[in-house]
């Protein structure tokens, strides 16, 4: 019977520290992995170059890193970027970056579909299917950040924290 690997980004820093201790390793390895996942946006264990190959292989044995894929991107002449984002389960959401003269706004999806019936909104025509996981919200911001060359000063960790709190 095949075992399904757990998405490592569903673990808290404390969970990661405890995992490494159970494996007979130092707890600080959990801090290193957490930093790779949430500050450096690593999508592969091989990217975690300050970990030994053995440690990376052990992580690969126990976990996966589910991530999104920008399936289509549209850029308008005013600089707006709209991404159709494919989630790890194949569902699609959208994220948009809207630059103006005074500020730049990033709109990211927090759920697939919507339970409201706003007439002006295309998403409202979709049946609400599920809330996004914190990592799926985070990945949308990372994707927008990479495309726009914007520098988001610490909002990624704040967004992640908010998403975890909201999840409970």
List each language-model region with its residue ranges:
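Conserved Radical SAM active-site core
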Residues: 91-95, 101-110, 115-168
